[in-house]
Design a protein with these regions (language model features):
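Bacterial N-terminal signal peptides that target proteins for export
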Residues: 1-9
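Hydrophobic helical h-region of N-terminal Sec-dependent signal peptides
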Residues: 9-15
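Electrostatic cytochrome c docking/interface patches
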Residues: 15-34
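Positions in alpha-helical segments
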Residues: 29, 58, 99-101
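The canonical Cys-X-X-Cys-His
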Residues: 35-46, 114
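C-terminal capping alpha-helices of c-type cytochrome domains
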Residues: 91-125
């Protein structure tokens, strides 16, 4: 799978954090758990937090309606505002500016799990 990452990202330090996941039996369940832990502070990710999120952050159910939803989710870490606080091993930081949210680390495999969860939202529409 090809992942696009803008060349604007220079070099910097990665912050390593651990992400405990509950016991889930499949990719979509793991993706939901990751979404709940990492994304729900800004986005409505489904019925879990339908009254949550930040007002100007699009909900997962809204974003999945876009024809390029999969690419957007797979490359979210390179799309503003995510690069300031999202760390992906093997990719340089976007800026030396301090993050305005606590930074977190996510792997490309974990992003694939989130996409598996989001696909269930798309299929349920």
């Amino acid at each position: 799978m090809i992942r696009i990452f803008p060349s604007v990202f220079a070099s910097a330090l990665l912050t390593v954090t651990s992400l405990p996941l509950s016991r889930a039996s499949n990719s979509a369940e793991l993706g939901f758990e990751l979404s709940r832990q990492l994304c729900s502070r800004c986005h409505v990710i489904g019925e879990y937090n339908r009254m949550g999120g930040i007002g100007n952050s699009p909900s997962f159910t809204w974003m999945v309606k876009s024809s390029d939803w999969r690419e957007r989710f797979l490359t979210f870490y390179s799309r503003r505002p995510h690069p300031v606080f999202t760390r992906v091993p093997g990719y340089a930081l976007w800026s030396d500016a301090p993050p305005y949210y606590p930074p977190f680390e996510i792997t490309l495999d974990e992003i694939d799990l989130i996409v598996a969860y989001v696909e269930t939202l798309r299929n349920s529409q």
